[in-house]
């Protein structure tokens, strides 16, 4: 990796990426030396553009000869870093990041002679520093350099969510009210609220469009995107101005939220009772009276789910589309469902019940499984295209990702179950620092450092810090959490696990 990225930190105004946050040096020495080291590593990861911090690189692995794209600032990767800085009273880097990515959004976006939508946000960007000319240049990637060449659907949603978190944390509404930020939100919303051929309120997506950025069979209506979509809509609703343009979008958002919450809570939700109902489904039903609305064939239910599903507990399945229900558990989508109140309070508690009941499967020795269970053998070959990185219990195919610790912690605090977070943090503290902050862990229980995992992975570091700070001060959860709106509450039905 070229060190020019770090040279720029010193080149223009003397600021250094090694500045240490007040929290880390003043308080964490007495609390936990691991926190101090984490803060130092997070500060080292800062990227500067013309003397100002604009993000954090994905990883700074001294031992790795191949840099690949780990020296870039990824939008989704920066979110836990941003939350850590906000919780520590350092909003400048977050503000700079939001404005810089907004500027990048306005660029022409061409991939193989095809122009992307105006609202598309980059997957990542890289700062190139010329020490001779003392100039900094930003090069953005909208998916043209990614595996599979897929544009990130989640980037725009994370941007809106982070703008709300900045506003909630600082109390500064002026940034969100800027004309360019209002326009940026509207452009993102235009992409996902446009009318088309869909009969569902969910977003149709390609494989590899989110954190699961390789072929993993999530094409269709993946839970991660739907949950982020819901949260971004609610975030935008609270920040759009009540002018003519803003009101037009607000009306669309309210209608979409109502339809989306009903759809997700009705058709994506799975618990013991609903599983039993699907098991007994009739097929080939026509007309609006159909119970099996998606014509899911009971014989397509995988064997593992019957043992996995506890009597108390439930979760949002990975995907629902015609004649297809992906029963896999995806951690990020379910945690975001809790934080955004896409899940009802009863469903939120049921998700936490499931995590407790299936701790060995979903948490094991390192929190948290990104996806469960892993695909193997013939299924792995067909679904992933024989992807050597996504072999069973590795990477996105059942790997354990420490960054998810902050999401689990936030969900635990919101549902009044902090003991779940405390237990998970203790597991992480036993290994993360000693292992050099790996990107992910492999194995059915998450025991082994991932076979291709980078060390000094920034979001593993930031995820741990955010989890610790939220446990230390649970009010921090408010910047990323939302309470349920009364108009979205559905009539409660089915699910013995909710009571």
Swiss-Prot record:
Organism lineage string? Eukaryota, Viridiplantae, Streptophyta, Embryophyta, Tracheophyta
Q: Which gene encodes it?
A: INVF
Q: What does this protein do?
A: Invertase that cleaves sucrose into glucose and fructose.
Keyword annotations for this protein? Carbohydrate metabolism, Glycosidase, Hydrolase, Phosphoprotein
Any S-S bridges, and between which cysteines? none
Give residues where Phosphothreonine occurs: 20
Residues bearing the modification Phosphoserine: 11, 497
- Is Phosphoprotein one of the keywords? yes
Q: Which Pfam families match?
A: Glyco_hydro_100
Q: Which reaction does it catalyse?
A: Hydrolysis of terminal non-reducing beta-D-fructofuranoside residues in beta-D-fructofuranosides
Q: What's this protein's name?
A: Probable alkaline/neutral invertase F
Protein EC: 3.2.1.26
Keyword check for Phosphoprotein: yes
- GO terms of biological process kind: carbohydrate metabolic process
List, in alphabetical order, the Gene Ontology terms for molecular function in this entry.
Answer: beta-fructofuranosidase activity; endo-alpha-N-acetylgalactosaminidase activity
Family membership noted in the UniProt record: Belongs to the glycosyl hydrolase 100 family.
């Amino acid at each position: 990796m070229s060190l020019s990225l770090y040279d720029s930190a010193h080149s223009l105004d003397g600021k250094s990426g090694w500045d240490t946050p007040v929290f880390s040096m003043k308080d964490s020495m007495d609390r936990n030396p691991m926190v101090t080291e984490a803060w130092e590593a997070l500060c080292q990861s800062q990227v500067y553009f013309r003397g100002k911090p604009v993000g954090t690189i994905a990883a700074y692995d001294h031992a790795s000869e191949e840099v690949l794209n780990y020296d870039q600032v990824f939008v989704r990767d920066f979110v836990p870093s941003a939350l850590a800085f906000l919780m520590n009273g350092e909003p400048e880097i977050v503000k700079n990041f939001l404005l810089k990515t907004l500027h990048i959004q306005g660029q022409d976006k061409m991939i193989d002679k095809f122009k992307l939508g105006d609202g598309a946000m980059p997957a990542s960007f890289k700062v190139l520093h010329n020490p001779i000319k003392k100039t900094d240049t930003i090069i953005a990637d909208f998916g043209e350099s990614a595996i599979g060449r897929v544009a990130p659907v989640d980037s725009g949603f994370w941007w809106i969510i982070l703008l709300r978190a900045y506003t909630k944390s600082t109390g500064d509404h002026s940034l969100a009210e800027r004309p360019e930020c209002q326009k940026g939100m509207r452009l993102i919303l235009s992409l996902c609220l446009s009318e088309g051929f869909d009969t569902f309120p969910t977003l149709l997506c390609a494989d590899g469009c989110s954190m699961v950025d390789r072929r993993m069979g999530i094409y269709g209506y993946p839970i991660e995107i739907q949950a982020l979509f819901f949260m971004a809509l609610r975030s935008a609703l609270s920040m759009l101005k009540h002018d003519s343009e803003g009101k037009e979008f607000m009306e669309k958002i309210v209608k979409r939220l109502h339809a989306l919450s009903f759809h997700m809570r009705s058709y994506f939700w799975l618990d013991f009772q609903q599983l039993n109902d699907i098991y007994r489904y009739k097929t080939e039903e026509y007309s609006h009276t159909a119970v099996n609305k998606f014509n899911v064939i009971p014989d397509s239910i995988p064997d593992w789910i019957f043992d996995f599903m506890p009597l108390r507990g439930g979760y949002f399945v990975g995907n629902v589309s015609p004649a297809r229900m992906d029963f896999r558990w995806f951690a990020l989508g379910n945690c975001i469902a809790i934080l955004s109140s896409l899940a009802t309070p009863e469903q939120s508690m049921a998700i936490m019940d499931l995590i407790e009941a299936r701790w060995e499967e979903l948490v094991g020795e390192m929190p948290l499984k990104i996806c469960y269970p892993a695909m193997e053998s013939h299924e792995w070959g067909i679904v992933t295209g024989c992807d050597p990185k996504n072999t069973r219990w590795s990477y996105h195919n059942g790997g354990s990702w420490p960054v998810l610790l902050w999401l689990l912690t936030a969900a635990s605090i919101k549902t009044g179950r902090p003991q779940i977070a405390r237990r998970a943090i203790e597991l992480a503290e036993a290994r993360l620092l000693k292992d050099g902050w790996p990107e992910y862990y492999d194995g059915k229980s998450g025991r082994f450092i991932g076979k291709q995992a980078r060390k000094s992975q920034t979001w593993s570091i930031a995820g741990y810090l955010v989890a610790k700070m939220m446990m230390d001060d649970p009010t921090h959860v408010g910047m990323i959490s939302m309470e349920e709106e009364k108009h979205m509450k559905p009539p409660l039905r089915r699910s013995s696990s909710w009571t």
